[in-house]
Amino acid sequence: MPQSKPQNKAKKESRPDWRHYNLTTAGLVDDYLYSMLPKRDSVLAEMEDYASQHKIPIVGPAVARVLQQLALTIEAKTVFEMGSAIGYSTVWWAHAVGEKGRVIYTDGDPKNADRARRYFERAGVADRIILHSGDALEVLSEQKEQFDVIFNDVDKEDYPRVLRLIPSRLRKGGLFITDNVLWSGRVAQKNSKDARTRAILEFNRLLYDSKDFYTTILPIRDGLAVAIKI
């Protein structure tokens, strides 16, 4: 009996570079979550491609959907984003707050801010976003109002400092959300000498111990800390 010829299997789509950054979610599970995501619009898709090509870490669509869902859940109208890069998550926030909402973008790289501005215009959300090119902690420290959501994705060594600024600038019932809190599993290394790992460990401990917040870490991607102000 003649043997059938082996069929060529479809080539599996390779992961974009931004999906490799600090990945905690198990590979097969991450692939499954990614396969379930609805197709993004052309601007978001282009931002994902740009981030992959230029090795710019972004939260990616799986986490971005969580961020947007959380904002919608509390009917957030004001978001302060710390560490916005090219503005990928900023666009998701802008869609969540709606036409009358406001998102503050912060990033220390003027080139990132310029690129983000162009993306915002093309995405039709530029009128909802205020851009600040500079140190996110300094910009936050200058704010007099209380926000519905504060999203923290700055340099990891600064995480403990960020926490000290949050309580007076977040409304009761507001959300303080922080990315990368599982740090590719390195938080399990209690005796780590790495400065970033130690800063995240301290931040997580302080956040859970804080009487101002009720905190849960979601083990999606690289770990997302969601703290509600009480």
Kindly give the residue locations of the regions a language model identified.
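S-adenosylmethionine/decaboxylated-SAM
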Residues: 61-230
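N-terminal auxiliary segments of SAM/dcSAM-dependent transferases
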Residues: 1-41
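Short glycine/proline- and acidic residue-enriched helix-loop micro-motifs
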Residues: 50-54, 187-190
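Conserved SAM-binding loop and adjacent beta-strand
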Residues: 35-39, 52-66, 72
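Short, basic/glycine-rich phosphate-binding loops at helix/coil junctions
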Residues: 44-50, 183
